[in-house]
Amino acid sequence: MAVASRKLGALVLVAVLCLSLPTGCLSSQQAAALFIFGDSVFDPGNNNHINTHVNFKANFWPYGQSYFSSPTGRFSDGRIIPDFIAEYASLPIIPAYLEPNNDFTHGANFASAGAGALIASHAGLAVGLQTQLRYFGDLVDHYRQNLGDIKSRQLLSDAVYLFSCGGNDYQSPYYPYTQEQYVDIVIGNMTNVIKGIYEKGGRKFGVVNVPLIGCWPGMRAKQPGNTCNTEVDELTRLHNQAFAKRLEQLEKQLEGFVYAKFDLSTAILNRMKNPSKYGFKEGESACCGSGPFGGNYDCGRIKEFGLCDNATEYFFFDPFHPNELASRQFAEMFWDGDSMVTQPYNLKALFEGKPSTKYLPNDEL
């Protein structure tokens, strides 16, 4: 009886310790953790907890209406890409880092709407990429304190790190630099953050390229005659070409560095040009927003604004963000797509620890 009491007491103590640690108790059998960095494409609600302009928040109706019981701060009618990636990886939804009392056992989401690689991009209105890296460093210290050096190193090396960044940097004037110089500065800052994560133990990276936003509803609404903004798309093309080369260089320079790069830009353009092929009725106008193409960024931000009857029919939920259905489609492609969309590996390969298997197009398998 005394032995049984001691065993029960030990179990209770372990349970109490697990509940008292923000990182919980890691099991050797659990799925790899997921850490997320970037902008509004990946923001789960971090901006709810900073002092910023209403344009950088989405914690009000009708955001979240298609899935969540109340708005969460996601710039969507429902879930976003990281939510689906977590599901496919057998993980719970990864929590916002700035939300109080969250459990970071399975990772953390640092993404912030409006964030850029450059400190000047929406400074004071978003959590920039360098600050996100600093928050990650604080969490790494916490893991080491609670798990010890060996377990924390294992967690960090097994984890996958998602990135969506750069788009906000190209919506501001780049003078006095040339386009090439400006792109090089942006990519240099992104590279420094990736290397910073690598130095703390990260090895597996999932990145999306920057979408061509020049013809999006929110951009056309700002243009004379509601035309497309070709200059921002020129910069974005230069960025995507240069960043692809930089990732190849990092793979050669950094031992153990592997990555999955998803061509989000092409996936979006395909749905804008041929929405019915992908299950949408409208590919150019936003469900939520007033004015031409629903491009005025007033969704939920003023008393009267345009709102469609069925958000799933519109590729764009608001003037700058796709709906939940589109995010699910993108996540599926990112997760197990072939090399036509995700190179040189897909996320499934990274999570399963099989980065030695490269994926060929379906017609070459």
Swiss-Prot record:
Uppermost EC category: hydrolase
Tissue-by-tissue expression: Restricted to the pericarp during achene maturation. Expressed in the leaves of mature plants and seedlings, as well as in buds and flowers. Present in disk florets.
Position of the signal peptide: 1-27
Domain of life assignment: Eukaryota
EC number(s) recorded for this UniProt protein: 3.1.1.-
Site (Transition state stabilizer): 137, 168
Localization terms from the record: Secreted, Extracellular space
One of the protein's GO biological processes: isoprenoid biosynthetic process
pH sensitivity of activity: Optimum pH is 7.5.
One example GO MF annotation: lipase activity
InterPro entries found in the cross-reference section: GDSL, GLIP1-5/GLL25, SGNH_hydro_sf, SGNH_plant_lipase-like
Pathway: Isoprenoid biosynthesis
Disulfide bond sites: none
Keyword Aminoacyl-tRNA synthetase belongs to the record: no
Induction text: By wounding.
A GO cellular component entry from the record: extracellular space
Role, per record: Component of the monoterpenoid pyrethrins biosynthesis; pyrethrins are widely used plant-derived pesticide. Acyltransferase that catalyzes the esterification of terpene acids and lipid alcohol substrates into pyrethrins; mediates the transfer of a chrysanthemoyl moiety from the coenzyme A (CoA) thio-ester chrysanthemoyl CoA to pyrethrolone, and, to a lower extent, to jasmololone and cinerolone thus producing pyrethrins (e.g. pyrethrin type I). Can also use pyrethroyl CoA as substrate.
Name of the protein this chain belongs to: GDSL lipase
Organism: Tanacetum cinerariifolium
Lineage of source species: Eukaryota, Viridiplantae, Streptophyta, Embryophyta, Tracheophyta
UniProt gene name: GLIP
